[in-house]
Amino acid sequence: MERLLITLILVCTMNNITNAQNPFYGQYHTPHETVPFDRIETEHYEPAILEGIKLQNAEIEAIIQNPEKADFTNTIEAFEESGKLLDKVVAVFGNMLSAETNDDLQELAQKIMPLLSEHSNNITLNEKLFARVKEVYNQKETLQLTQEQKQLLEN
């Protein structure tokens, strides 16, 4: 039992060290939060993408499990705010893949692109999420939305 506990503590500690060293976690701490390309390694992408998928899945689940009536804030805005980490990592990965590709990035793309497609499909085809969005959309004339909110709802 003691050995198991020590192993678990070591794994958690190593995970925290790895997370602390991955520039995708947290703020970049660069002028204007520009991407610190000099600190990003190929091995940073996959764990950050997997964590981003996990976080967005939890965010989507929170939206669809919300017991309150669907409204602009708890559905549309919440959906818009979901997936920030994933968006951040995928944007950098996509740009690097097209601008400075190499065999390692292409191999990683072969591995993660199906995961990203599946994740996207799971969101866009989620019937419970669609029902909440539709409920808000059907009220759009009575919601007194700003132009920006209307555009967000339409898209």
Regions found by a protein language model. Give the residues of each.
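N-terminal helix-rich structural modules
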Residues: Q21-N155
